[in-house]
Regions:
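PRPP-associated nucleotide enzymes
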Residues: 1-116
């Protein structure tokens, strides 16, 4: 992580210190609460542009992200790349395309890292 990005997480209060049990079951002394950073639209745009610069090397047709946490990042990355952004929502406990979103066979996607 760049010093600039880390400074933005600290500036917005999005880098939390304490004891955290992660979804993986591992423990951490620090936690990045991205929602705290993303509430600052100017900073969110800046951070997503940093991410976009790393993604420009990849060919894609669309950007896809999970609701709810990934929508802002997906939208900003899609905007910066000039690509369509779609998102998934939980349906019966699994992520699914809803709201009429479709992915063409063979389409190249950039996926938000929350997908597992």
């Amino acid at each position: 992580m760049s010093k600039e990005l880390l400074a933005l997480f600290r500036k917005t209060g999005a880098l939390l210190d304490g004891h955290f049990v992660l979804r993986s079951g591992l423990h951490s002394r620090e936690y990045f609460q991205c929602a705290i950073l993303l509430q600052h639209t100017d900073i969110a745009e800046r951070v997503c542009k940093m991410l976009t610069e790393k993604l420009r090397a990849f060919v894609c047709d669309s950007v896809i992200s999970p609701a709810l946490g990934g929508i802002i990042v997906g939208q900003e990355v899609g905007r910066s790349l000039g690509k369509r952004h779609i998102f998934t929502e939980k349906e019966d406990g699994k992520l699914a395309l809803r709201r009429g979103f479709k992915i063409d066979h063979g389409a190249m996607l950039i996926c938000h890292p929350l997908f597992r």
